[in-house]
Amino acid sequence: MKPTRHIAWGALLGPALSACGPAPEGEELDLSSQEQGLEAGCTALSPSIASHSCLHANTSADHVAVTATSGLTASTPSLTGTHKQFDVTLPAGATGTVKFTPGTTGSWAFYLNKSITFTAKSGATTLSSALAQAVSTSCGLTNYTVYNLTAGTTYTLELGTASGNLVGVIPERVEDYNTRYYQDADGDAYGNNNVSILSACVPPAGYVTARYDCNDSNASINPGAAEIPGNSVDENCNGSLSN
């Protein structure tokens, strides 16, 4: 993940990237990262994505029943839309096939509620996953696999055998959950406005979400510190030496 400089482009921002997904912090958005795949060095997605997926897993109105086919056929169904849990019925004791066409280019995480094999294909080509991890959630999701996908391309998803021949699948576009993290060089839990990364992954050590540290080399100086009047030091970073 490459640090980026502060960019004061608040006026260029559009609305939140999804109706129920979190919007990244406005005035420092790195617009180019919204179209890139999963960044190098990402070892795990932010737990906030799984938490959001659980909202859909726990909401009956967000569940959509789909019956997979045995292999790709003319009747193979598509997982259409986002912010849904697709309850996919598989062929008895066999692998099931569904289709998925992303509306936006980027990294797509597929959260599952059973630990089964999960493969994405473009035509006859099996895609390499960008990331695959087990996950512990309160709603029963067990793992996710991330693929870098192109908008408008129809992919084939193959789901391995599952107990009860049923598995829940929740597709989430990873970039919709980008969060701005700031370098905290002095370890006081407040970061440097001018050194930050935009990521939907677990941040590297030394990066935090709080900012406005006016001296990131001194842990006693930050927005949460008590001001000491009369010492010519702005301890609480509010621009005043007296309060």
Tell where the protein language model's regions lie, with residue ranges:
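C-terminal motif of bacterial Sec signal peptides marking the signal peptidase cleavage site
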Residues: A16-A19
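Non-catalytic, beta-strand-enriched accessory regions in extracellular/secretory proteins
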Residues: S75-W108, G140-Y147
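C-terminal edge strands of extracellular/lumenal beta-sandwich accessory domains
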Residues: G26-Q36, A40-S70, A120-A130, T145-N178
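Non-cytosolic beta-sheet module surface loops
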Residues: P102, F110-K114, L159-T161
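Surface-exposed beta-strand/loop patches in noncatalytic accessory domains
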Residues: Q85-P91, S115-L141
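Membrane-associated feature with strongest affinity for ZDHHC
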Residues: D176-N243
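Bacterial N-terminal signal peptides that target proteins for export
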Residues: M1-G10
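Bacterial signal peptide processing site
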Residues: G21-P24, N238
